[in-house]
Amino acid sequence: TLLSSIILIWVGKKIDDFDVLKFSFFVISLLAISTFTFSKINSITFLFIAILLMRFSGQGMMSHTASTTISRYFTNTRGKALSTGWFGLSTAEFLMPVTIIYALTIMDWRNIWIIISVSIILFLPLVSYFLVKEVKLSSREDDNEVAKENIKQWKRSEVIKDYRFIIIALNMLAMPWIATGIFVYQSFILSAKNWGEYTIAQSFMVYSIASVLTLFVAGYLIDKFTSRKLLIYMNIPFLISLLILIYFQSPVSSFFFLGLIGVSNGFANVLGSSTWAELYGVKFIGSIKALTTALMVFSTAFGTAFFGLMIDFDFSIEQISMISGGYILISLILLFLIKNKLNPTIL
């Protein structure tokens, strides 16, 4: 995971320089190779290579390519476009586990990976061709309102020196690192709270529904009010969810706990792309998004390690939640202090 995030910083920025269709074919091919590699695993070394390719091409480059392209070529309806794109991902997260579980009952797991790889090669290039065949590098700026408004197009080297980027990133990274820790160590939460073994699994239905519904609400609100004005509210439901985890013991509270995380996740998915485009322009959005996506991937690894370390040091789930909530609160306060400065630079 860590290695894939480092590679993503360099490879991800190339989307600014290449034709979208060709870049998409590259990412699709890489994903097909990674899934096929899983079908041939016979050693720890091969497993490492397969996971590296999967994390890089799947979680990293596929989402990076989609969100970057939408952020660049949509302006007035960017929020709705991003929410529609993320809806596809959320739908897959809901349907694919069920599909794979069923497939495991009728065939060997290696054959499943081969089928996935072949399906990727057969269908995704065709879909990509019809979706972005007319999108060229030359069409990027001509009729884009950002260009007409003479908004500064920030390079990545400039963005990383901007204090606003650091503060926004602190808020953006709360979801991936804390939520990943919660999801990975859900058995620890079940044990600590004396909840039934299926409590969190059932609560995930509420999480999924809340996340998907919030996607579309967020998309509409972004187009109406801008990402910059909504950003301050993104992690408030998440903070409340941690307070629920700290102070409530009833199994019913898990539905509110994960439901509120779903609300913040829905907002974070859309705001995580649209905010950078609004604030820093779209000319170099690929390199900027490559950095933020890499940070997201890195933070998921950090979250797993952090929660594991805290558990090893005998921290309770309430104490871990307090630390996590403290992080969210501090990042929210910092964001509140600069909320009036979250405007693009006009040339």
Give the predicted meaning of each segment.
Residues 1-12, 205-217:
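Central cavity-lining transmembrane alpha-helices of secondary-active solute carriers
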Residues 45-61, 253-267:
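Hydrophobic core of transmembrane alpha-helices in multi-pass small-molecule transporters
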Residues 157-215:
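Extracytoplasmic gate region of multi-pass secondary transporters
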